[in-house]
Amino acid sequence: FKVGLVFQYPEYQLFEETVYKDIAFGPTNMKLSEEEIDSRVREAAGFTGIDEELFERSPLELSGGQKRRIAIAGVIAMRPEVLVLDEPTAGLDPAGCRQIQENLCAYREKTGATVIIVSHSMDDVARLAERILVFDKGHVVMDGTPEEVFSRPEELTGIGLDVPHATELAMALR
């Protein structure tokens, strides 16, 4: 499986009657064996911090953070080579954000998958990214390491992006 996409709003990709079935949807459609499907569901749940006690509950009755983790698990269960996430931490509390970020880093490290995160949170980007592409009106306007991109705070703010708090502090101390 090549590319997996996780939408910004998990409600748009959750539709099965149970958490287990939702995570299993992709692998089931890949025509995998029941044993392989079960293995992938449990592995993806582990990567995303979903307790197996939730497997028989409806995903639609869970919290926003739980829904987001289930949506991510459903895509991870297909083992994509490239995982694309649109605003994966939007609307989450700081603890939820950290957990999602840690889970994504663990997934990338264990599988070697490319993880692409679309985000307006420059603090998240600074913590997670090895390479940053900044787009403005559909065009790439910056491409580099976090250090290279965040060394240009005026350009970032000029296109409506904030700079990470650490960058703001460093600029204030100069």
Locations of regions flagged by a protein language model:
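Catalytic Walker B motif of ABC-type/P-loop ATPase nucleotide-binding domains
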Residues: 83-86
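Conserved ABC ATPase signature
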Residues: 58-62, 66
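Conserved catalytic motifs of ABC-family nucleotide-binding domains
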Residues: 79
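H-loop/switch region of ABC-family ATPase nucleotide-binding domains
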Residues: 119-120
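Conserved ABC ATPase "signature" region
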Residues: 35-53
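A short, surface-exposed alpha-helical micro-motif characterized by mixed small hydrophobic
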Residues: 125-127
